[in-house]
Amino acid sequence: MIRYLLAIAVAVCSLVSLAQAQAPDPQNTLVIELKTGKVLIKLRPDVAPKHVERVKLLTKQGFYNGLKFHRVIDGFMAQTGDPQGTGAGGSSLPDLKAEFKISPAFKRGSVGAARQGNPYRDTANSQFFICYDGCRPLTGEYTLWGEVIEGMEHVDKIARGEPPRNPDTMLKVYLLADAKK
C-alpha cells in the first residue's frame, strides 16, 4: 500500500513538473489575434536577443495592431509587419543586423525577421514571416526569433497572395504578460 501511494505521489509530482515546464513564459510569449483565433509565439531571446527586444518594443507601442499580411505564399510563409502593406516599409527604428550565433533550422511554425535582399543581411526592421513549410533553405540566411506554440491552424487560414486580394490583418498583438492589464 505504501509503495502504491508513493508511486501515485511521484506520478503527480512528475505531472506538475511537466506542466510547469511546458507553460509558456508570459514575458516571452507573443499573442497575435486573427479573425479566426489566437496565435501564440514563443520568443527566442536565447537565439536572437536584439530581434526579440525589437519585437517586444514595437508590440508594447501597438505598432503591429491592424497590420496586414501583405505577402502570403502557399506552402512557404506568411509575411507581415509593414505599416505600408507593400513589403517596403518598416518602423522608424534603425535596421537590425542578422543574428546567427545560434541558428536553429527553420521549420513549420518558425518565425523569422524579413529583410531586404542584400549580401549584408542587415536590413531587418519590423517585418516578419511565419513559415508554413519549405523554409529550411532560410536557415542561416534569415534570423529566426520565434516559434508558433499554439494556433498554427489559424495561420494556415490566412488569405494567400502577393498581395492577397482581401488580406488578413493582425487585429491585436501583445505579450501574454500584458494580456490582463
Residue ranges and their predicted role:
Residues 1-8:
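Bacterial N-terminal signal peptides that target proteins for export
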Residues 2, 14-181:
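Cyclophilin-like peptidyl-prolyl cis-trans isomerases
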